[in-house]
Each structure stands twice: as structure tokens, then as C-alpha cells.
């Protein structure tokens, strides 16, 4: 059995935002095609403002900066990006 891939999306999910819905759909479509178990979780930007970010972000195999700003916390978004850059973490920004 394949190891589960865990992707954290840094952003504030809005179910009515087409790009947010499409991001989830694209990830799950790719995982299905590749037969890779996938866990996707949106990481709200306010949760990444403080020291908790250093505990939250390493749990994920890769990070995506969500499309569709503005973010509830620009500081939280920047902390997520900074974590990926300084830890050489897999990261996609849109």
C-alpha cells in the first residue's frame, strides 16, 4: 500500500470561491490518477501567525499557497512561505 501524501494549503478556505474548490478537485484528481492516498487540509492563515506555525507546518509533506487573496492574515501567509523557504520544504505558490 502506498504511503499517504499530506498536502497543507495555506489559506482561508471559502466554499463559494471557485479557485478553492478547483484546487481541492485538482489535487484529488491527480491522487486518484496516480493511485496515491491523499490528505488535504486548509491551514487558516491566522493559525500560522505565532509560534504554533512551527508545529503545524512540518506535519505536511508539501505546502501550497492558496489562490484567491486577500488572506485573513497576511502575516500568517508570509510565515508559511518563510517556513517553506528556510526549511527547503516542497512548496507551490500560485
Each predicted region: which residue ranges?
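N-terminal beta1-alpha1 cap of cysteine-dependent amidohydrolase-like domains
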Residues: 1-94
Amino acid at each position: 500500500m502506498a504511503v499517504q501524501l499530506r498536502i497543507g494549503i495555506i489559506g482561508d478556505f471559502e466554499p463559494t470561491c471557485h479557485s478553492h474548490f478547483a484546487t481541492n478537485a485538482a489535487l484529488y484528481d491527480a491522487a486518484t490518477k496516480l493511485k496515491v492516498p491523499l490528505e488535504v487540509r486548509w491551514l487558516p492563515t491566522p493559525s500560522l501567525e505565532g509560534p504554533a506555525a512551527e508545529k503545524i507546518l512540518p506535519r505536511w509533506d508539501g505546502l501550497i499557497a492558496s489562490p484567491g487573496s486577500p488572506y485573513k492574515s497576511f502575516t500568517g501567509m508570509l510565515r508559511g512561505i518563510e517556513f517553506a523557504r528556510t526549511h527547503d520544504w516542497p512548496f507551490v505558490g500560485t
